[in-house]
Design a protein with these regions (language model features):
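Inter-Walker segment of RecA-like/P-loop motor cores
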Residues: 2-49
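Glycine-rich nucleotide phosphate-binding loop and flanking beta-alpha elements
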Residues: 41, 59, 89
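Extended hydrophobic-aromatic, low-complexity segments
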Residues: 45-46, 61-63
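Structural motif
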Residues: 50-52, 81
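Walker B catalytic acidic pair
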Residues: 54-58
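Non-catalytic, compositionally simple segments
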Residues: 62-69, 74-182
């Protein structure tokens, strides 16, 4: 909704979309996009055509995922997307998705429509060479502001690694205690 309220885009986008804080609707095809909170209660019965899970590293279990995905199939051609950085919650859904992705990519397991796109350094030592950062952040060459932010975070991490552990986890895709990724 924020992009629809941005003065830079508001006029152009309002011709194509109607929006409130809860819903965005296409004016031409009447397609509706709704956001939901992280509360699984009362969500049974949804008829979702597309479900996007953001920041999957925060999910401790499958409660929310099950509620939103069991409604799929009631609508033709259902789709799911899982988008996240790495995180510190072990043995949660993210670990399962990463393991499945590695089996698909490296062991030949059938994908069944699951497209893993995993971006991370191969080992911790690579972090000291900025040319490797693109492995964990493919958009760095196109976003100079992001590159500058990652450089700042890297310097802070070098000075105080114990206080800035999120740098390795979220920016470089390597959890604390992890030795190698691939």
């Amino acid at each position: 909704v924020d992009v629809l309220e941005n003065p830079k885009w508001e006029k152009k986008l309002s011709r194509h979309y109607y929006h409130t804080k809860e819903v965005i609707q296409g004016r031409k095809n009447k397609g509706v996009m709704k956001g939901h909170t992280n509360n699984p209660k009362g969500r049974d019965g949804l008829r979702s055509g597309k479900v996007i899970f953001n920041e999957v590293h925060q999910y401790e279990n499958y409660d929310n995922i099950k509620v939103f995905t069991t409604g799929q199939g009631k609508v033709a051609q259902p789709r799911r997307g899982y988008f996240t950085s790495n995180g510190d919650i072990s043995d949660g859904p993210l670990d399962d998705y990463l393991a499945r992705g590695r089996r698909i990519l490296f062991e030949g397991e059938a994908d069944n429509g699951f497209l893993p796109f995993i971006c991370c350094l191969n080992d911790k030592a690579q972090v000291h060479h900025p040319e490797n950062w693109q492995m964990a952040n493919p958009s760095l060459p196109y976003l100079p502001e992001l590159y500058a932010e990652v450089e700042d975070e890297y310097r802070e991490w070098l000075e105080h690694p114990e206080q800035n552990g999120d740098f390795m986890t979220k920016r470089m895709g390597i959890r604390s205690g992890a030795k190698e990724i691939a």
